[in-house]
Regions:
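Gly/Ser/Thr-enriched, mixed-charge loops and adjacent short helices
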Residues: 110-230
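Phosphate-binding and adjacent anionic-ligand microenvironments
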Residues: 270-430, 435-460
């Protein structure tokens, strides 16, 4: 049996610490396992890309060897943003591709996001890869696969510039956090006619300035300062592999992804009445009524880019988003999450207004908490912990209890959510309400439920 760390096989991707849990040997074996799954589906060619992390080239060589030793042909697109790899996979390889990325994890992490035949690998499909490795159940190749290298950045750029049309040039600031988006985003937005100030767009896998994770306000502070001191109208930020978007107004307000989705939904629905719009369980309760008001059909889904993508395919939804910043456009695009493309669509909408920040600031808003995290005791299963808590929980005054992903409890004046993270051993909590008093009342009800398990510590 091959020696491989089981805990790198996560819910949405494979992710580990390079040289410790994610070794060269592991990358080679995972390459062979993906190739085995591909062969079962009759897939013969896979696109392969990497982000700007220092460990990327080494891991890429190993996974590529795993593919070619298994008879799979490789389209190597080099250093790209994750959405550019998806673009290459869909346009050149029938929807099959592997992206080597650590996303927003610390510099010593890396991992793989995978799609085969147009389907993102997640959940059981990722566990099946582990089973293939552990059983040594690899496909026997009758030939060595070939490798073709191609720069797809020009095609990706031209496709977007070809169909996104701004009403006027805008002045914007972008912050790539030294992630791979920095190599492409500035050129893209200039190509759309904008004046662009670039922050931390030099690709550097050490992330020397701040962490490339726009979902955390501390990572947007440089952008906020630049917007306040300069003459730009709006700020865009990206995570390490540029599949997520952060948005900041001229006056330094962070427009969280559930509010961004209001604007995107309104725009898409103006051309496609009755279209479905998907959002994750963490999103504001003001979103579903907004979608209905603009003629759409709101669909709540569990958190995770792979779940959202599969629900989009099933339902034919035209746009989707989740709180972490993944935005998915099926209308005029390919349905994968793409932070750079979402930024372009946002500029297209906002270019029709003289004061874009005012448009964003006027979007409906409640009082909400940032995400609160509770560490789980070692070895415990977060989903089981939530199930046990939910079994005996009482929520006074609740109007609805939603259990698609953890426990989301709706009240007339707010909601509370607790769910198990799929990527780290924590419980995630979020609260939103019309008033501070209502938030505290809802939090106190959740606190009582959490504290019914003595191993859990209330985070506030």
């Amino acid at each position: 049996m091959a020696n491989i760390a089981r805990d790198i096989f996560k819910a949405y991707d494979i992710r580990g610490i390079v040289g410790k849990t994610l070794t060269d040997e592991a990358a080679y074996l995972i390459g062979k396992a993906i190739a085995t799954k591909a062969s079962e589906k009759g897939i013969t060619r896979i696109a392969l890309g990497r982000d700007g992390r220092l460990s990327g080239p080494g891991l890429m060589a190993q996974i590529q060897r795993g593919f070619t030793d298994s008879g799979i042909d490789v389209l190597n697109v080099g250093m790209v943003a994750t959405p550019m790899l998806y673009f290459a996979a869909i346009n050149e390889c029938g929807g099959s591709g592997v992206m080597i990325t650590g996303s927003h994890n610390p510099p010593d992490y890396n991992g793989f996001k995978m799609m085969l035949g147009g389907d993102t690998l997640a959940g059981e499909a990722i566990q099946e890869l582990l089973a293939i490795v552990e059983k040594d159940g690899f496909v026997a190749a009758d030939k060595q696969g070939s490798v073709t290298e191609k720069d797809i950045s020009g095609e990706y750029h031209n496709n977007i510039v070809g169909h996104i049309k701004l009403k006027r040039p805008m002045k914007i600031v972008i912050d790539a956090g030294n992630g791979v988006g920095g190599a492409f985003a500035g050129k893209l937005y200039k190509g759309l006619g904008n004046e662009v100030t670039e922050l931390f767009c030099e690709v550097d896998g050490n992330f020397p300035n701040h962490h490339p994770d726009p979902s955390k306000p501390k990572n947007l502070q440089d952008l906020i300062v630049e917007l306040k001191n300069g003459n730009a109208e709006i700020g865009l930020a990206f995570d390490g592999d540029a599949d997520r978007l952060g948005v900041v107004t001229k006056d330094g307000n962070i427009i969280y992804p559930d509010r961004q989705l209001m604007l995107f939904a309104q725009d898409v629905l103006s051309r496609n009445p009755k279209a479905k719009v998907i959002f994750d369980v963490k999103s504001t309760r003001l979103l579903a009524p907004w979608i209905k008001e603009h003629g759409g059909d709101p669909v709540m889904e569990k958190t995770g880019h792979s779940f959202i993508k599969s629900t989009m395919k099933k339902t034919g939804a035209l746009v989707a988003g989740e709180m972490s910043g993944h935005v998915f456009f099926k209308e005029r695009w390919f349905g994968f999450d793409d932070g750079m493309y979402a930024g372009a669509r946002l500029l297209e909408i906002l270019s029709a207004f003289d004061n874009p920040s005012e448009v964003l600031n006027k979007l409906p808003q409640s009082i909400s908490t940032p995400e609160l995290n509770i560490d789980l005791p070692e070895g415990s299963n977060g989903h089981k912990v939530i199930e046990e808590l939910a079994a005996n929980a009482k929520f006074e005054g609740a109007t609805e209890i939603i259990t698609i992903d953890g426990l989301r409890v709706e009240f007339p004046d707010g909601f509370g959510l607790m769910r198990a993270s799929n990527t780290t051993p924590i419980l995630v909590l979020r609260f939103e309400a019309d008033t501070q008093e209502a938030i505290e009342r809802i939090q106190n009800q959740f606190k009582a439920v959490i504290e019914s398990n003595p191993a859990l510590k209330w985070p506030l």
